[in-house]
A protein has these predicted regions:
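A conserved structural/catalytic subdomain of Rossmann-like adenosyl-cofactor enzymes
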Residues: 1-451
Length: 456
């Protein structure tokens, strides 16, 4: 992983696209290049999804990472459209080798040969293009020379000819890291918010449907015997879309009783705290804990969270929600700074805020506040392996979002290859006089229709 720890990761692509799985099958059959052996070479045709489908940490990305970090990817050649029978999609040839010559080691060549073709005299389904012998020779020579060739535009501004670039393996890699912002919440007990607690969050719609039809009967054991067949048929209906585990859960009386107990506990809190609107969620949770303690109500962590989530919501005017206040001695601060590559005064950029600086009463110098992050405001950045994560944060994030911090534990390593990124050529806008003359010519051909439309 990012910290250098070995890990077992997913290397299975999605079931709808098995191209990379077939490629890995071929990789597994490669002969060894050790002990003077020649090793193996692979040429495999893919569509564009193999280049970039899958986020960091996904099966597709991990397969690309495995191939590139082992230095097996030699080159990728983009082919012209309509080169294959019955498909017009863009295709690519992946060239792999486990015995690269020294000059190609640690590098990957990308060749854009999408404009290297000649038209067939007669179409074969979607196939209307082919390589000429000269095209093949040009592509082969570009590969053998490991040449860097700049793409060209013709007189009409359209791409023409071949283009080629050579990259270091790590140029295709990136770190994906979460950018967190503090949660700010308002809270208020209301009849509507408490009523929602009657139902489990994961089964809210289904439980509501059942309760509307049968009411408080759902809390009686004989209900599940009396309507056993009807309930089973209802739960298994395609309309409800319930999994086996969900069907079992919703037809278990304990599920209903547990939710009823949670709702009643919330009513107790409501009676004690009233319907006051709290703009400081930290104060609100303290009051909730005091009421629970006074009434000797013991809630599981998930039950407590369900109540708090039901009666609170994000509001940018609220106070920041404190997750915890921790004590960091000098050795712990040094360890964190070494891990994050920062100075003690920069720990706030990694989610550790000096308690004295953020207004915590009676805070000690070695106490730090850790805020709850807002899932609604969470963002992620993809940062090249060639750039430091913290340097990127200071340059691209901190100037725009002062409250943001890096979640360094969320880092995932990804790999993707974008031909458009490397071979895109800007096409200059056409001259206005040229456009006007073309319109006038079309006007003549259309018997003045365009002139009438333009009011001229």
């Amino acid at each position: 992983d990012y910290w250098g720890n070995p890990q077992v990761v997913d290397a299975t692509p999605r079931s709808s696209d098995g191209q990379l799985l077939f490629l890995m099958e071929m990789v597994s059959k490669m002969k060894s290049s050790r002990g003077g052996e020649k090793g193996s070479r692979i040429a495999s045709v893919h569509n564009g999804s193999s280049l970039f489908t899958g986020d960091a940490g996904s099966g597709e990305s991990n397969i690309r990472r495995h191939i590139i970090e082992n230095d097996w990817l030699d080159a990728i050649i983009q082919l012209p459209n309509n080169l294959f029978y019955n498909t017009g999609i863009t295709t690519y040839i992946w060239l792999l080798s486990n015995n690269k010559p020294s000059e190609r080691q640690g590098k990957v060549q990308l060749i854009d040969a999408s404009q290297m073709y000649r038209k067939l005299k007669k179409n074969l389904g979607s196939k209307n293009s082919e390589f000429s012998p000269q095209d093949i020779a040009t592509i082969t020579q570009a590969y053998l020379d490991m040449a860097t060739i700049r793409g060209q535009l013709d007189a009409k501004g359209e791409p023409t000819g071949i283009a080629s670039q050579v990259f270091a393996n790590q140029d295709f890699g990136y770190h994906k890291v979460n950018i967190e912002r503090p949660d700010r919440r308002h809270a208020q007990f209301t009849a509507e918010s408490i009523a929602k607690l009657r139902f489990d969050n994961s089964l809210s719609d289904a439980m509501n449907t059942l309760y509307e039809q049968y009411g408080d009967e759902v809390y009686q054991a004989e209900f599940y015997t009396k309507y056993k067949n009807d309930l089973k048929k209802w739960a298994e209906s395609e309309e409800m879309g319930l999994s086996l585990a969900q069907r079992k859960k919703i037809l278990d009386i304990e599920t209903w009783k547990n939710q009823l107990a949670i709702m009643n506990h919330a009513k107790t809190l409501w009676e004690a705290l009233g319907d006051v609107l709290y703009t400081d969620f930290n104060l609100f949770t303290k009051k909730v804990e005091n009421v629970l303690k006074t009434h000797d109500i013991k809630l599981k962590a998930n039950e407590r969270k369900q109540i708090l989530d039901a009666v609170s919501w994000y509001d940018e005017t609220g106070e920041k929600v404190i997750k915890s206040i921790t004590t960091l001695k000098a050795d712990k601060i040094q360890a964190l700074c070494e891990r994050f590559g920062c100075q003690p005064e920069q720990l706030a950029d990694f989610g550790y805020y000096p308690a004295q600086d953020v207004g915590v009463e009676n805070a000690k110098p070695d106490q730090y506040v850790i805020y709850e992050s807002s899932s609604e405001l969470r963002d992620s950045e993809s940062i090249s392996l060639n750039q430091g994560i913290y340097d990127y944060f200071l340059a691209e994030v901190r100037p725009h979002v002062s409250e943001a911090w890096l979640d360094m534990e969320s880092i995932k390593i990804g790999y993707e290859i974008s031909f458009n990124k490397y071979f895109y050529q800007h096409r200059p806008l056409r001259n206005l006089d040229e456009v006007a003359n073309e319109l006038l010519q079309l006007d003549k051909e259309a018997d003045g229709l365009i002139r009438d439309i333009l009011g001229g």
